[in-house]
């Protein structure tokens, strides 16, 4: 968090997604969904969000009579946009900033409590959403991640939230080492780019591969196993194969 002063008033500004409150994140997602729907211009939405962060409830802060304060806020606005600009889905740093939605519990940070079966379903929906989405992919993603009943329809905020969290976790796992129990583990060896045009992660067919090993039991047993347990098992298998080739 960063402390600034607007006149005599101290304001605490978040410096990353880890610092934002539930209300700040919800407001951001509402504005972002409005931008995507074409209801508001992106720059206007970003200014509105920044005004919310600094608690500005008056005239436009960009036209303040106090030039020094106005210049300071403009500079801060540009600095802040580096990490929450609305030209892209937010990188939530693998943190679930919306743990509850209408009483429905979402996944833990880093999808810590998600089963392998649910993770694979989410990967399919994520892939669909990145290619050509008519809304079915983001709805499916939200239903799996928040275990929504058939009568509950996810809103735009929840759909964006699920896409953002899923993208953040997959990007972190597939791009390089991450810390697991104090040890750096490079899960990128599990993800094989170019495995097929319909398989951007390279994880298609992996469930059958793991089931054949019998480590987690049958096909159903693998799907019911924690996602991280299966990922670490796959990591060990990939590393063993690499050693055999040397």
Predicted regions and their residues:
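An amphipathic, hydrophobic-aromatic interaction surface with interspersed Lys/Arg
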Residues: 1-246
